[in-house]
């Protein structure tokens, strides 16, 4: 359980937590017959590339990993598109649908005095557009990108870097994320954790439990208030 006297800062993951990565299907619909299938493989491969990059010291900005992953997903489905068409699809990551609960939940935390940050694998340009598109610029102190230290989640150094950037002892930060691997990484580094389980997934059967499991950002705010 949370010790509310201890938590002063809340970091939020971005993709899948604040914005809906499944919205990428919209950008694919004009180009492929099975946008849902391509979108899922695109997302899965993108995460796999970020995990692999951390293990073999092959860092590239997340937008570029996303580009490689899109190419793989299209190739796997036998879809041949021009570079311009691929770029058009890729640009959806600058305007993914924002979950309706994001701003109300973050507003409650902001009004209660918490310092709010976005902590993401996304490179700075992606995060700038996300904050603008989500209309949360007035609520967050800043964004913190994996690009700053060239390490992706769930590397402990990224969460420790976030603690340094926010000027907060790591055990006074609550990290709110939709990805269980992200929650585990934050917990391992010493943060409090809130898993946003939007699709009612089963919990991972290893490495402990988050401090709280919620359905959305508004419920996350209730847990912290």
Predicted regions and their residues:
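Alpha-helical elements of Rossmann-like donor-binding domains used by nucleotide-donor carbohydrate transfer enzymes
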Residues: 26-27, 68-72, 88, 104, ...
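Short, surface-exposed acidic
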Residues: 34-41, 77-87, 139, 170-171
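Short, acidic loop-to-helix structural element flanking the phosphoryl-transfer center
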Residues: 81-118, 128
